[in-house]
Design a protein with these regions (language model features):
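Extracytoplasmic beta-strand/coil segments of soluble accessory domains associated
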Residues: 106, 110-146, 150
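Transmembrane beta-barrel wall of Gram-negative outer-membrane proteins
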Residues: 219-246, 251-286, 301-326, 333, ...
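A beta-strand signature from Gram-negative outer-membrane beta-barrel systems
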Residues: 162-212, 224, 581-585
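Gram-negative outer-membrane beta-barrel transporters
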Residues: 429-435, 444, 536-539, 557-645, ...
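Signature of Gram-negative outer-membrane beta-barrel scaffolds
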Residues: 377-476
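Outer-membrane beta-barrel signature, preferentially recognizing the C-terminal barrel domain
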Residues: 292-320, 356-358, 411-417, 457-474, ...
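Short acidic/polar hinge/loop motifs at secondary-structure boundaries
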Residues: 128, 147-176, 193, 263
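Short, acidic, small-residue-rich periplasmic hinge/interaction motif at the N-terminus
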Residues: 49-98, 106, 136
Length: 706
């Protein structure tokens, strides 16, 4: 599908052998379509002759890059391949991840031009992730298409139960995406897709097993251990991984411990491909010294978070690919625990200690219909959020309070929300065009239950409509031009509504944020090069931020700060300079990636604002350069250089990372360095980042087939 066609040939449908002397001449200059082959003919055909064989070598630099044109990406409600998608979805591949100096998912996202990663701690501890000048509460995080975002606060959205070794690819959808993924995708979405192999169509019951073990250690007493295994047996696939990381931290009061476990399973009917089940279960926990994470006045903060997630989904295919219906029901569950101490080891509400328990139970259904006029999709996603807390929500009757293990304190406050997302979308697929139009009808019900002051239910109801239109034009298979307009609405988080302490004050009367975004982008792609340019304009109303209203303010207040317009442009390029590492000269560049983004912001408000904590501290400039080099034989070197300038008083900085890697068939050894120049820099407020951080380790792989 990647070859260009200049002279369209006439087609001849082959059904059987005529055994005539002139038959072969009828085929000259014509495209022959094989309509029927007998069983005896197929039995004499070798697999090597009818399929493309891909040889996997030990060094990832020696593997030819697989084009992603036919990978289904999250750019629309209906399942569309990247080539047909009406938008450009940035995809970070497994090869990109393996070469990067990355210890966490957050480190990988730093290399994406349109993504802003504001790090408080190392190895993905407490990281704010945003897209296109937005804030950390304005994106949706998905794991294999399941929403794992935290509606309490986006600060904890990066508590992933997976490691970089578990990931097949990461999809980044920039811009307002509510009509595709729900109201939380206010400014974009990130979908993490994990590794998993499905049983072959032959239905062989021969078990297959592949496993890995990883150990690494380095600066500041950092130690990581992890393992994973993938088992195929009959119609079932199973992937299980786990890991543990600990460190003394690179700065004062930044020590941490992290643990995770993840399982993903699947079942399909092999030959028929009519039905498939996917199920996953994951858990992560981390405890860390929070330094000055939330207030520069307190440098001895502490936090512990826990995340449990589970989902079960099915895919039912009825009819044919051209004229058929695909049904996708799913249920999912997320549980979050958050224990925060303003002063480490100091307990009690008066000392700023709080506990939060959050449960999210949801169900979704999507129907994709392929018919004469295109691909239509209708669906719904309904979820119930319930938070019990010592600080968030309304006071509850004492007999309903929840016990907290290990302390005499109890969860005495509660709030719950029911989120209903109703979707409709239609896609028109033409030879050179894809036109996708859709809308989201969102209903939010906030219920504070029977409060302690009155035996009544405090109830708030809002509903909004978010339409959108995406158009792509493909003049050739190398070019793609996209134009889109989408609206989105986001409800405040529980932190926005209810926080009340010596450093912050929320506001229960906050209005939902509104956003309207226009975007135009272009992609040029060949086997050796890829170039992307895009520009966007977003118009936001009732935007939420934490601010000092006057110079005398001592607490940040959650506030609707008025209108906020973001205008930006980004450029990305990737050049494959040399395909075969075996024939390359020592230190010869193999792949070069270059990215740059620029954002200008315009703010209008009637509210007095002295200082902004998040929304006005956007990245104006971001430049990324990545270089992969072949050194000798199985030895390779990868560099990453990043320069960025943040507004609202931050100094611009350069950061250089590197990874030296030796890779054999079953063993990988590496040495990686973060912040090689030991540059002093800040991503958030007064939270100082570590200097030079060196890690060394290895990954051992086992592959068995019985």
């Amino acid at each position: 599908m990647n070859k260009k066609s200049f002279n369209k040939r006439s087609r001849l449908l082959f059904k059987h052998f005529t055994r005539k002397n002139y038959a072969l001449f009828n085929c000259l200059g014509r495209e022959v379509l094989i309509g029927m082959l007998s069983v005896s003919t197929l039995s004499n055909a070798k697999a090597n002759g009818i399929c493309v064989k891909t040889e996997l070598t030990g060094d990832s630099l020696q593997r030819k890059e697989v084009r992603l044109d036919e990978v289904i990406v999250s750019g629309s409600r209906a399942p569309l391949a990247a080539l047909q998608s009406p938008v450009i979805v940035e995809v970070i591949t497994r090869e990109d991840i393996q070469r990067a100096e990355a210890s966490s998912v957050n480190d990988i996202l730093k290399l994406a031009t349109g993504v802003d990663v504001r790090q408080r701690g190392g190895f993905g501890v407490q990281t704010d992730i945003s897209i296109n000048g937005g804030t950390f509460d304005q994106i949706t995080i998905l794991l294999n298409g399941t929403n794992i975002s935290n509606p309490q606060t986006g600060h904890n959205a990066s508590d992933f139960p997976v490691s970089v070794n578990d990931i097949e690819r990461i999809e980044i959808l920039e811009g307002a995406s509510s009509r595709i993924l729900g109201n939380a995708a206010f400014n974009g979405a990130i979908n993490i897709v994990t590794k998993q192999s499905y049983p072959s169509a032959s239905g062989s019951s021969t078990p297959q097993l592949s496993s890995y073990i990883e150990l690494e250690g380095g600066s500041y007493g950092t130690l990581t251990a992890g393992a994973g295994t993938n088992v195929l047996a009959g119609n079932f696939s199973n992937y299980l991984s786990g890991g543990y990381t600990r460190s003394d931290g690179g700065t004062e009061n930044s020590d941490f411990e992290k643990g995770r476990i993840f399982y993903k399973g699947g079942w399909n009917d092999n030959r028929q491909n009519r039905f498939r089940l996917d199920y996953q279960l994951g858990a992560s926990t981390q405890s860390y010294g929070a330094n000055t994470f939330y207030s520069a006045k307190y440098n001895n903060q502490y936090e512990k978070t826990e995340h449990l997630m589970a989902s079960l989904g099915g895919t039912v295919n009825l009819g044919t690919d051209d004229r058929g219906i695909q049904l996708k029901p799913a249920i999912y569950y997320n549980h979050f625990n958050d224990h925060y101490q303003l002063i480490r080891h100091e307990e009690g509400a008066a000392k700023g200690e709080n506990y939060h328990w959050l449960d999210i139970l949801g169900a979704s259904f999507n129907a994709n219909i392929n018919w004469l006029m295109g691909k239509s999709s209708i669906g719904a996603d309904i979820s119930k959020e319930t938070i019990w807390s010592t600080a968030y929500g309304a006071d509850q009757p004492e007999e309903t309070w929840k016990e907290i293990k290990g302390t005499e304190r109890r969860l005495s406050r509660k709030a719950s929300r029911t989120n209903t997302n109703l979707f409709a979308e239609h896609n028109i697929l033409l030879r050179h065009w894809t036109i996708s139009a859709g809308l989201l009808y969102y209903i939010n019900n906030l219920d504070e239950g029977k409060t302690a002051e009155k035996a009544a239910v405090t109830h708030h109801h809002t509903s909004t409509l978010s339409p959108g239109l995406d158009i792509s034009y493909r003049p050739t298979q190398s070019w793609k031009i996209c134009l889109s307009w989408n609206k989105a609405v986001r409800t405040p988080t529980y932190t926005d509504l209810y926080t009340s302490n010596v450093a912050q004050q929320g506001d229960p009367s906050l209005k939902p944020e509104e956003n309207s975004m226009f975007k135009i982008s272009a992609l040029y792609k060949t086997n050796r090069a890829e170039f992307t340019v895009s520009s966007f304009y977003s118009h936001g109303r009732n935007m939420i931020d934490w601010v000092y209203e006057t110079e005398e303010s001592r607490r940040y207040h959650a506030l609707n700060i008025g209108k906020l317009d973001n205008m930006g442009v980004s450029l990305n390029s990737k050049l494959q300079l040399h395909e075969d590492a075996k024939s390359a000269f020592p230190f010869q560049p193999m792949t070069v990636r270059l990215g740059y983004s620029y954002i200008h912001q315009s703010h209008k408000t009637d509210q007095p604002i002295y200082r902004s904590l998040y929304a006005l501290e956007y990245l104006r400039h971001k430049l990324t350069v990545q270089l992969d080099q072949h050194i000798w034989n199985r030895l390779s070197l990868s560099w990453s250089v990043r320069w960025q300038q943040r507004m609202n008083g931050f100094h611009p900085y350069w950061k250089i990372d590197g990874k030296l890697q030796w890779k054999a068939e079953n063993l990988t050894l590496y040495l990686k360095g973060d912040n090689l120049t030991a540059h002093r820099y800040y991503d958030i407020g007064a939270v100082k980042q570590p200097g030079l951080w060196i890690m060394a380790g290895g990954i051992f792989q086992i592959r068995l087939k019985r």
